[in-house]
Amino acid sequence: MKKTWLFLTALLFSSVAFSAIDALNFSSPQQESDYHQLTQSLRCPQCQNNNIADSNATIAVDMRGKVFELLQEGKSKNDVVDYMVARYGNFVTYDPPITASTLVLWIAPLLLVLLGVVFLLRRKPKTQSAVKSQEILTDEDNARLAELLNKDKXMNFTLIFILTTLVVALICFYPLLCQFKAKHGQKRDDLNKALYFSRLEEIEQDNSQGLVENVEQLKQELQKTLLDDVPSKVQENVDYSGKSYGKIWFISGVLALGIIAGPSYFMVGSWQAESMLEQTYAKLPYFFDRMKNEDKNPFSDTEMQQFSTALRIDLQKNPTDAKKWWMLGQIGMNLGDARLAFDSYQKANKLEPDNVQYKLGYARILMFSEDATDKLKGGNLLREVIRQEHTNIEALSLLAFRYFETEDYKMAAVTWAMMLRLMPKDDERVPLIEKSIRTARDALEAQNEEKSKSITPEK
């Protein structure tokens, strides 16, 4: 008895499974291939997530039959698709045509990018005046100017944040603002009615040809199917009454996006670092005043770092100020940042190549380099300085050190002796230079003895 029930259950499910398979007689393999391709590429209007080949809905069965009928009439695949689109709308295809609503989704991101580019170009700093701001503005004016610039930047950030939020919200929530010409329920009713009359016409044709016997029963079944597919008015109102709240949902989505984006930026964004940089830059006039009393009140390491940061920001806005580049090089030397000093001195010398002070600072950093090419370039710069100023003690000192380093002890001693003649006798550096001269002469004698030994053959 148990085996009999299992057999009947299996037979029941197998009959249900095979009921979805259409028994069709194709005239050619190509026609069969076209049929399967079309049924897999057309979407079921009732199921929406399935194609008509996989759907068992009544409308899907009728659509499969219509596809077969049109192919039997010699229609092409494009003709079949055009027929289905004309009858059921663009929804039945998985590749709908481009419309105004789809263009918005494609063009909006490009417009957002173009808007950002235009904004960046408009923010490009204008050409700075040739007159230095420090000569025409007081410290109070500089402080007020920095405060105004900070307000403008905060206003720009707020406008960008609001604009970006609105554009993203429009792209994401645009469908909520769309006002459809017909409701979903009305479209479905019209589709079911059209299907009902089409099927009724087919039954009448089959009856006139004597292909069916129980015409009334088929009509009653068709009417029952129509009633089952069309829900009651109460259910229709309950299911789709919420569609009138599209604008409310849109506003809620925009607010939610702003609430999420704002705290997220303040948590992980770089606004704190940018704010600190702006505060440091605003202290630049204060650092210039401190330089006047640096001997009595020297800079601390922290203040030196802040001064360096403020100068960098200022040089980004006015990169042609050679004096500030030289000052940044001096700060780099005090901080022990050789790369900062090298780049700053190089920039200052490039902007004003005839300035002896800038050329001397660049030559000094080159002389301290371990690269032979840099040392050679530094020596050439020192000779240029001495040709411009024959009495430049610092240039002579660096050149004498260069001679001593290359074991040219004679020129080192001569250069130091020249420095002695230029310096006052009571100068604190005189004993050190005299000692350097003696060291150079001793090294020269040892060098000459070594040369004489190498020249004189041993007996």
UniProtKB/Swiss-Prot annotation:
Cellular compartments per GO CC: periplasmic space; plasma membrane
Subcellular location: Periplasm
GO biological process: cytochrome complex assembly
Residues the record lists as binding heme: 44, 47
Keyword Nucleotidyltransferase in record: no
Leader sequence segment: 1-19
InterPro entries xrefs: C-type_cytochrome_biogenesis, CcmH/CycL/Ccl2/NrfF_N, CcmH/CycL/NrfF/Ccl2_sf, Cyt_c_biogenesis_CcmI, TPR-like_helical_dom_sf, TPR_CcmH_CycH, TPR_rpt
A single MF term (Gene Ontology): metal ion binding
Stored CDD domains: CcmH_N
TPR repeat residue numbers: 322-355, 393-426
Keywords assigned by UniProt, alphabetized: Cytochrome c-type biogenesis, Heme, Iron, Metal-binding, Periplasm, Repeat, Signal, TPR repeat
Annotated family: Belongs to the CcmH/CycL/Ccl2/NrfF family.
Function: May be required for the biogenesis of c-type cytochromes. Possible subunit of a heme lyase.
NCBIfam families recorded: cytochro_ccmI
Protein's name in the database: Putative cytochrome c-type biogenesis protein CcmH
Organism of provenance: Haemophilus influenzae (strain ATCC 51907 / DSM 11121 / KW20 / Rd)
